[in-house]
Regions:
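Short cysteine clusters
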Residues: 15-22
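C-terminal scaffold of the Radical SAM
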Residues: 5, 13, 26-52, 56-268
Length: 268
């Protein structure tokens, strides 16, 4: 029997501290007990739907919605093991996750490796000035060299992605340019350029000028724009987002996640 190809998303709409320039709907604050209960509820949801989706084959898995790494590493490992035991998952299905840089550490990496996470999208937002420290209660900027050249580079895989903001008032044109250049100088395989939201947002013309300059710099460095504002080294394009853009059905679990299946869209 031919299986129906789908992509899967686990939605974690949580963030430790929401920055003013973030337009996404997120739950602010770190509550370990709450997050664990959320994972247990998601596990029940996955189990309950498995039989009805037995004719589907998962081509890619995305852990997103917020900073997915705010979830305990062992809980994420539990969810991914459950998915592989209850669902048909393609052997080469990538697993990508949106992460706060501070969570790429010795406590979590063993669980991420066991979960076969293939790429970590680090929420940096800006490298000049460094902005990701606003995502947590501590300033983790001193860990940056350790993060990028330690665990991830030692992986010897194309496993590091960056998330950068464009169109932000407090980041000058030259600061944004420097941030993009840093992407080209580090072992980064994927880049998402996210539009700044809220009061910190530049007007459309200035924001577009930053995008145009980024496009030139990234193209010169060998990156390819495979979807709007998503850049990758050749062969490192994101299968999840490609599937979504090409109309592939989406199995989604978690708060505010939307599923697209057989022409119907439902939201949790």
């Amino acid at each position: 029997t031919t299986l129906h190809p789908v992509v899967m998303k686990l939605n974690f709409p949580f963030i430790t501290r929401k920055p003013s320039f973030c337009g996404r709907t997120l739950i602010e604050g770190h509550n370990t007990e709450l997050l664990h209960r959320y994972v247990l509820a998601m596990a029940l949801e996955l189990k309950a739907n498995a039989a009805d989706l037995a004719d589907c084959e998962v081509q890619a898995i995305r852990l997103g919605g917020g900073s997915a790494s705010i979830i305990n590493g062992s809980d994420l490992d539990h969810l991914l093991r459950l998915i592989r035991s209850c669902y048909h998952v393609a052997e080469d299905a990538p697993v990508t996750m949106r992460t706060c840089p501070a969570d790429i550490n010795g406590a979590n990496m063993p669980f991420y490796n066991r979960s076969h996470v293939t790429r970590y999208d680090l929420e940096l937002y800006s490298l000049e000035p460094l902005d990701f420290c606003t995502l947590d209660t501590l300033n983790y900027s001193e860990q940056m060299p350790y993060i990028t050249h330690g665990f991830l580079r030692a992986d010897r895989r194309d496993s590091m992605g960056f998330v950068l903001l464009y169109g932000k008032k407090t980041v000058s044109r030259w600061g944004f340019r420097h941030s993009v250049l840093e992407v080209t100088r580090r072992p980064v395989c994927h880049l998402l350029l996210q539009r700044c939201a809220g009061a910190d947002m530049l007007d459309d013309a200035e924001a577009q000028a930053q995008l145009d300059e980024a496009a030139q710099l990234l193209t010169e460095a060998g990156f390819v724009q495979y979807l709007p504002r998503r850049w990758a080294k050749p062969g490192c394009e994101d299968k999840f987002w490609q599937g979504v853009a090409n109309g592939m059905d989406v199995l989604a679990f978690g708060l505010s996640a939307y599923t697209r299946l057989d022409g119907m869209i439902t939201t949790n």
